[in-house]
Amino acid sequence: MKRVEKRRETIQIKTEFIKLDAFLKLCDAVQTGGHAKLVVQDGAVRVNNEICTQRGRKLRPGDSVEFENVIYLVE
């Protein structure tokens, strides 16, 4: 089985927290809020290494979001 190398990106937020669906749009992982809702509901997103199905989940600096072989670090 081939191991997929995951790319890492650091995304800075200017507020105390950001909701998961807004974060996915901010880092250009998805194009629309509707797409963000679908990928989160489908269990395609991991937050801090756990599958997350709450699109309103609050992300804070230090959290990580994994989607489509990219790990986004919230800073």
Language-model regions, residue ranges each:
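Ferredoxin-like alpha/beta domains used as RNA- or RNAP-binding modules
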Residues: 1-27, 51-75
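C2H2-type zinc-finger recognition helix
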Residues: 33
